[in-house]
From Swiss-Prot:
This is Large ribosomal subunit protein uL10. Gene3D superfamilies: 3.30.70.1730, 6.10.250.2350. It comes from the Bacteria. SUPFAM superfamilies: Ribosomal protein L10-like. It holds the Pfam family Ribosomal_L10. Belongs to the universal ribosomal protein uL10 family. The gene is rplJ. GO terms for cellular component: large ribosomal subunit.
Length: 166
């Protein structure tokens, strides 16, 4: 089915806006995945703040041409499913990684983060990034641990001085 030029321009503009707003991108091949499974993936993507779209490769190359995701141009072959993480850099990678566990035919091709190309075997690095809340809780536990250690040290010094004075 042929797409009209106006529709192509609209698709390129929409994907370009998503790419400019995106923190990371993940590209996959979804051949053989059922419609029901893809609908479930799209629903999970909306909930996770991830923009997911199947786009023709030539349109996709034009859409990401002036963005940091142009490093993915070489993997735009065959049916291409692209996902842009809008809220957290690892959201799309985590979503696709979890989805691939239940779908044998779903193949993650590559990802891009901060203008760097990540091959399919490097997706785990991006997927394992902590979310904002996880990172804050990790930071707070480090700060709390250091503060309590300082308090115990000061108490020990005080106790030593009291013992020496007595």
């Amino acid at each position: 089915m042929a797409i009209k030029l106006e529709d192509k321009k609209a698709i390129v503009a929409e994907v370009n806006e998503a790419a400019k707003a995106g923190l990371s991108a993940v590209v996959a091949d979804a051949r053989g995945v059922t419609v029901g499974a893809m609908t479930g993936l799209r629903k999970e993507a909306r909930e996770a703040g991830v923009y997911v779209r199947v786009v023709r490769n030539t349109l996709l190359k034009r859409a990401v041409a002036d963005t940091e995701f142009s490093v993915l141009n070489d993997v735009f072959t065959g049916p291409t499913l692209i996902a842009f993480s809008n809220e957290h850099p690892g959201a799309a990678a985590r979503l696709f990684k979890e989805f691939a566990k239940g779908q044998d035919k779903f193949e993650i091709k590559a990802a891009a983060f901060e203008g760097k190309f990540l091959a399919a075997n490097q997706i785990d690095v991006l997927a394992s990034l902590p979310t904002r809340n996880e990172a804050i809780s990790q930071l707070m536990s480090v700060i709390q641990g250091a503060t309590s250690k300082l308090a115990r040290t000061l108490a020990a010094v005080r106790d030593q001085k009291e013992a020496a004075a007595a």
